[in-house]
């Protein structure tokens, strides 16, 4: 992707006076604060289920076509749980807590504190629904317990981030911290026992890993080690963390510290800010926790590099056409279930799911437009907001402000606009 230079602006993101421009269509909201109020209201009206877990998609009234307990047990539409409404609960809850907690810090309201705790309870539930220790589920069916047998590192990484954010927020009570610590310790022990792989239910055993020589893997593992040192007080975790920083490998052979310093890289698609943001969020936590000035500077460099790369995705928001009549369908069964077959390995489940999503996209083309032009630039905006360099943030305030103001959130079907709120709460008070 060609790098794009975004124009500077002398207007702050949160000032409410970003100019109306015609490039890429009219802006729906008069200011960013109004846009965020609507986004927040829609998230809580339609996308937070009865168990405090974000669902992936619903209709404009909030109706969700949930998989049944029987479908979850049978691995329908697929054993991964991909492309149905409870696909990404752990991921989205964990990441959205960044916004929920920053909102609470600003308002100190009981209502916002209650929303934070509701999201945390959702995360803890997803760690309590299986007999497999350390399992973090994606979401729950109508009975509040049935689930798909495989999670992933993309689910478990945000689970750690969200719980750490609450633990370190000043909102959590001592009793809540004790409870969080128990979940964190048990889950980490299970992951370590599997060689830093994520536990999954039979017949799969495991799926996804924090082990590997790549920015995303290296940073997630380092973050969990540092987190464990903080929440347990066990000095051996700090020692393991320090040793891990100097472990080298990959192509080219770099230390994990060097991978962190280099920032995120795209590797499985032209852009995938929406999944890479997990590691960038973990890197921000590492930057905040780290006291060694040299290492902290390296983490800041990784955050800067990630923000610069992510900013290239911001113009994608201009390609979303709200007037496009592309159909949304929540009927994933009619498209995906004709292809269903039993799966006994992770690869069989992946192959099935990839075929199914192509079929789903044919009856619900709105899925693709929101994924490409809402999900991706919104996640990119959050990545930019995580950068501690105010110069980088100021450079991209205009583009992020436009992104936030473009959309009528009451007309979006997928929850992945939530990242605009995470970005706004971090950037709204940045001086020009």
What kind of feature is each model-predicted range?
Residues 25-46, 171-173, 279-432:
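Terminal, non-catalytic domain-edge segments
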Residues 53-85, 132-152, 200-220, 258-285, ...:
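Carbohydrate-binding/catalytic loop surfaces
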Residues 174-311, 315-320:
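Elongated scaffolding segments in large macromolecular assemblies
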Residues 5-25:
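N-terminal export signals
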